[in-house]
C-alpha cells in the first residue's frame, strides 16, 4: 500500500474507489495499491 498525496491509475485494471472519505486505488497487481493521505 503506497500512501500518496495524489493517487493515479497506473494500469487499465486499476480502479479508483472512495471509502470512508479516503480515496483508494485497487488493482489485480498488489504493487498498484494506493491510498490518499
Curated annotation (Swiss-Prot):
- Among the Pfam families in the record, one is Ribosomal_L36
Tell me the organism. Answer: Thermus thermophilus (strain ATCC 27634 / DSM 579 / HB8)
Q: Enumerate the residues binding Zn(2+).
A: 11, 14, 27, 32
PANTHER family assigned: 50S RIBOSOMAL PROTEIN L36, CHLOROPLASTIC (PTHR42888), LARGE RIBOSOMAL SUBUNIT PROTEIN BL36C (PTHR42888:SF1)
For this UniProt record, give its keywords in alphabetical order, as a comma-separated list.
Metal-binding, Ribonucleoprotein, Ribosomal protein, Zinc
Q: Which domain of life does the UniProt lineage start with?
A: Bacteria
Cite the SUPFAM superfamilies for this sequence: Ribosomal protein L36 (SSF57840)
The entry assigns this protein to a family as follows: Belongs to the bacterial ribosomal protein bL36 family.
- What remark does the entry make about the cofactor? Binds 1 zinc ion per subunit.
Write the protein's name. Large ribosomal subunit protein bL36
- One biological process term in Gene Ontology: translation
InterPro entries reported for this sequence: Ribosomal_bL36 (IPR000473), Ribosomal_bL36_sp (IPR035977)
Q: Which GO terms describe its cellular component?
A: cytoplasm; ribonucleoprotein complex; ribosome
Which cofactors, if any, are listed as required? Zn(2+)
Is Zinc tagged as a keyword? yes
Instruction: Show the GO MF annotations.
Output: metal ion binding; structural constituent of ribosome
Quaternary structure (record): Part of the 50S ribosomal subunit.
Amino acid at each position: 500500500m503506497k500512501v500518496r498525496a495524489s493517487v493515479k491509475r497506473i494500469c487499465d485494471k486499476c480502479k479508483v474507489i472512495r471509502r470512508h472519505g479516503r480515496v483508494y486505488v485497487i488493482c489485480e497487481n498488489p504493487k498498484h495499491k494506493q491510498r490518499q493521505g
